[in-house]
Amino acid sequence: MNKTKVLYPGSFDPITNGHMDIIERSAKIFEEVNVAVVKNIQKKSTFTLEQRVEMIEKACKHLSNVKIHQFEGLTVDFAKQIGCSTIIRGLRAVSDFESEMQMSLANKKLNDELETLFLVADGKYAFLSSSIVREIASYGADISELVPENIVEDIKQRFNDK
C-alpha cells in the first residue's frame, strides 16, 4: 500500500468549504488525495451521485494532485482497490470524534493495514455541514460563504427545480 496516497471518502451532498479545507490541507501534505463520493443506498441524497462528483471536480480543479472517484460498498474495500492505506477524516466537534472513532475502529477490524488520520476543522468551519447548506439553500438564502464559489449556482439551481 502506498503511504503517500490517501482516501477522503464522504457523501458530499453537497461539498462545503469545510470539506474543501480538509482536501486542500491534505493536498499540501500528501502526494495524492483521492476524494471518493459514496453511493449509499440507505441514505436519500439531495444531489445525484453524478451531480456530487461534478461539483467536486469543479471545486477541486485547481488541485492537480486530487483525484475524484465514486464508489458503492465498504470504504475499506475501495481503499484497497485503489492502493490507499490511509483514510482522512475531518473533525468539527467532539461528537464527530465519537462517531469517526467508531468507524475507524471498525475499518481497522476489517483491514488491519488501514489507518485513519483526523484533521481538525478550521474554526470558521466548525459549524458547517452539508445538511446546513441544504437547509439554507432550500429557503433561497445566501450560501456563497459556505460552499466553493464555482458551485453556488449548481446548488441554487437544484433547489429552484423543486
Swiss-Prot record:
Reversibly transfers an adenylyl group from ATP to 4'-phosphopantetheine, yielding dephospho-CoA (dPCoA) and pyrophosphate. Substrate binds at residues 11, 43, 75, 89. It comes from Finegoldia magna (strain ATCC 29328 / DSM 20472 / WAL 2508) (Peptostreptococcus magnus). This is Phosphopantetheine adenylyltransferase. It is found in: Cytoplasm. One of its GO terms (molecular function) is ATP binding. The gene is coaD. Keywords: ATP-binding, Coenzyme A biosynthesis, Cytoplasm, Magnesium, Nucleotide-binding, Nucleotidyltransferase, Transferase. ATP binds at residues 11-12, 19, 90-92, 100, 125-131. The keyword Nucleotidyltransferase applies.
